UniProtKB/Swiss-Prot annotation:
It comes from Ligilactobacillus salivarius (strain UCC118). Belongs to the diaminopimelate epimerase family. The gene is dapF. The lineage of its organism: Bacteria, Bacillati, Bacillota, Bacilli, Lactobacillales. Its main location: cytoplasm. The active site is at residues 78, 230. One of its GO terms (molecular function) is diaminopimelate epimerase activity. The record marks 168, 221 as: Could be important to modulate the pK values of the two catalytic cysteine residues. This is Diaminopimelate epimerase. Pathway: Amino-acid biosynthesis; L-lysine biosynthesis via DAP pathway; DL-2,6-diaminopimelate from LL-2,6-diaminopimelate: step 1/1. It comes from the Bacteria. GO terms for biological process: lysine biosynthetic process via diaminopimelate. InterPro entries: DAP_epimerase_AS (IPR018510), DAP_epimerase_DapF (IPR001653). GO terms for cellular component: cytosol. Homodimer. Transmembrane segments: none annotated.
Length: 325
């Protein structure tokens, strides 16, 4: 079977189009395959953050995306991943703008101007947005948490919680705190499976404002750990940036978001009914085409596979190097 190794902002995945399989995978096999190929130590060619399964979508969409993390859990959405799936479906079906079915919503995606030569980009809708504790599976004694303390976590850092639709906990911090050990300490505790605040876990991001309209986001992703980038985290952080720092940025204005794996651009929108949604614009890089037997992938036998580089990764790295000059 063929898979694609892809990434958005360094957040890397394998794409597997289930329509191309000779034998359909059971639910158990979908999870096991993701766990085997994604393992950073024993997985396929260095592993990945997850597997993006592409399936036929329901009416009104041109495909469905399921996101299985490296630990076998399923994410409701993946902002970096959906851009790479958008590119795959765009090229497969010769479409420039269409909808992709995800767990909670059918999301608009469209081809965007490339970031540089051989660095194609896509624009993905990130929604729905909710601040309700029930949607976040959050227990802090409040219905919403916006720029407030959680004393059990820190007496010095204020947090905001938002689902987009996967849950995010966001804090605006200084550079020293951004790069320090607090993020790992707090996020590890909140994703240990038995804490009372987020019993199902949560994505945790620290955000530093670099200048008006430009932020840096560092994320500990639920089911993954520290990651180069998390698209929904960057979208959620952008939303909170607009809501909490309106003296610097506003709706319908482009925001540059830097992350350990690169950069994206975002824009926060507000519908007439008051609902928020975000545009997430960034690279959709295809690193390699992989061929491996279905049985070997499921069983974690990586002695016999082919790996054909596309050349796009070198172009992406050159683009990122130019950003940091």
């Amino acid at each position: 079977m063929e898979m694609l190794k892809v990434h958005g902002s360094g957040n890397d995945f394998f794409i597997l189009d289930e329509d191309n399989l000779e034998e359909p995978l059971t639910e158990e096999e979908l999870i096991q395959l993701a766990q085997k190929v994604c393992d950073r130590d024993t997985g396929l060619h260095g592993g990945a953050d997850g597997v993006l399964y592409v399936q036929a979508g329901h009416e009104g969409t041109d495909g469905r995306m399921r996101v299985i993390n490296a630990d076998g859990s399923e994410a409701s959405m993946c902002g970096n991943g959906i851009r790479t799936v958008a590119r795959y479906l765009s090229e497969k079906k010769n479409l420039a703008e269409f909808k992709i079915q995800t767990m909670h919503a059918d999301l608009e995606v469209k081809k965007a101007d490339k970031l540089a030569e051989k660095v194609p980009a896509f624009d993905a809708e990130i929604s729905p947005v909710s601040f309700d504790a029930q949607d976040l599976l959050m227990h802090v004694g409040k219905e919403k948490l916006i720029d407030d303390y959680i004393p059990e976590l820190s007496k010095a850092i204020k947090f905001s919680a938002v689902a987009v639709p996967n849950p995010h906990l966001i804090a605006f911090v200084d550079h020293e705190t951004l790069m320090g050990e607090e993020l790992g300490r707090i996020a590890s505790y909140l994703n240990n499976g038995n804490n009372p605040i987020f019993p199902d876990g949560v994505n945790v991001s620290f955000v530093e404002i670099l200048e008006p309209g430009k932020i840096f986001v560092r994320t500990f992703e639920r089911g993954v750990g520290f990651t180069n980038a998390c698209g929904t985290a960057m979208s959620a952080s952008s939303l909170m940036y607009v809501l909490l720092h309106s003296d610097q940025i506003d709706f319908e204005k482009l925001i540059t978001v830097i992350n350990p794996g690169g950069m994206v651009r975002t824009m926060v929108h507000k519908r007439e009914n008051g609902d928020y949604w975000m545009s997430l614009i960034g690279n959709a890089t295809e690193v390699a085409k992989v061929n491996i037997s279905q049985a070997d992938a499921i069983n974690g036998n990586f002695d016999n596979f082919t790996w054909n580089e596309t050349g796009e990764q070198a172009a992406y790295e050159a683009f990122i190097a130019q950003l940091h000059r």
